[in-house]
Amino acid sequence: MNILQEYRLKSTPNIFTREQCDEIIKNHTDYEHDVVRRDTALQSKYYDRKTLEENTEVIEDQNIRKVKQCSSNVITEWEGRPVYRCKVMKYEVGDKTDIHRDTQWMCQSNWWVPETNMVARDLVTIPLNDDYEGGQLKVENVRIKQKVGTAIQFAQSGDLDLPRALHGVSEVTKGTRYALVFWTFED
């Protein structure tokens, strides 16, 4: 099994047409900078949001480039699994996300919807445009081909004993990159 099979990397074409992607971009305008948090203790799918928050700290490092995001309800279910967190991410010139694994707090459903007691299984990203330069997606150090409207899915569990792929987006050097990003959840 190769590294990408281990992390269940798969691509599903034509989730949205280019026109639908343009409409998603047009309908999302209330962007805010992402808050960067770090887990300070092991998180549990049974914790409420207050407890999950108490087990994190906000990172105030000015060197961390904070990507803008806008909450969305475009996708609420994927492959029969609930989606509790969906957002449009906006990468402007100079924006990037370093290679990382998502922190546990964001992969616990109770942070987003109380008393659901689930953990993330997969992260899915759907490129919404391609009129930019840079902004390459990498999963486990492999550059992933991006096509507008195509879903790219890989393991990003909220359970530390299950697969959690390293991933990131290189710096955007020209234009603005938009992507719909969401997490699927399971018991």
What residue spans do the PLM features occupy?
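Beta-strand elements of modular eukaryotic interaction domains
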Residues: 1, 79, 114-115, 143, ...
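Non-heme Fe(II)/2-oxoglutarate
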Residues: 1-87, 91-96
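Short beta-strand segments enriched in hydrophobic/aromatic residues
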Residues: 16, 28, 103, 128, ...
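Residue-level preference for beta-strand/loop junctions
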Residues: 80, 118-120, 161, 176
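Short beta-strand or tight-loop elements
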Residues: 84, 95, 120-122, 165
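Short, conserved beta-strand element in jelly-roll/cupin
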Residues: 88-92, 106-133, 180-184
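Histidine-centered catalytic micro-motifs
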Residues: 96-104
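Catalytic core of Fe(II)/2-oxoglutarate
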Residues: 131-187
